[in-house]
Amino acid sequence: MPTTKKTLMFLSSFFTSLGSFIVICSILGTQAWITSTIAVRDSASNGSIFITYGLFRGESSEELSHGLAEPKKKFAVLEILNNSSQKTLHSVTILFLVLSLITSLLSSGFTFYNSISNPYQTFLGPTGVYTWNGLGASFVFVTMILFVANTQSNQLSEELFQMLYPATTSKGTTHSYGYSFWLILLVILLNIVTVTIIIFYQKARYQRKQEQRKPMEYAPRDGILF
């Protein structure tokens, strides 16, 4: 059976891993990743179109100083995109976030297992926890980079705008990233905290072993022989 200290420290890591899993589920399920404001100006209308979306769903609305505004439109991101580079990169972004979700789940399982058992010398021990959290942080960071690249360089919002308002001409776009996007940083932080807790545990375990060896190293020879 593990010591009380080990149980408490690995349970702490379990809760941070579980927190990471819950946050990623929230990121996947919400659509407040980005709001793109697209200026429109032509003979029939003048104003802005706001497109807010996440990985799966979004909505758009118009604010016009003159002209007849269309009602709000709800859409599925992947469904309205043609077979384009934007759709491919968006799909890869989703894939990496799902991979990070899986690694968070595995980290939760490994940390909980370590809190009730002692698989220290196997991959099920701290090595596995380090591996899954390292991969998870990497996957979610790549997700962040891919999404920014797709919106800024690959003009994902502009492509959605063209699909939603084919008869309207864009005069410029600005982007504002929402809380769903910034929660990715919280996931990375939780991965770091999980690993840090295990590092402190291993350091304390090593120091305890060293202290247990010292009495034997400095004991009188007669006492050792006895």
UniProtKB/Swiss-Prot annotation:
Gene responsible for this protein: CLRN3
Glycosylated residue positions: 83
Membrane spanning stretches: 8-28, 92-112, 129-149, 181-201
Protein topology in the membrane: Multi-pass membrane protein
Keywords: Glycoprotein, Membrane, Transmembrane, Transmembrane helix
Subcellular location, principal: membrane
Disulfide feature: none
Compartments (UniProt record): Membrane
Protein name, per record: Clarin-3
Record-linked InterPro entries: Clarin
GO cellular component: extracellular exosome; membrane
Cross-referenced Gene3D superfamilies: 1.20.140.150
GO annotation terms (biological process): sensory perception of sound
Family label: Belongs to the clarin family.
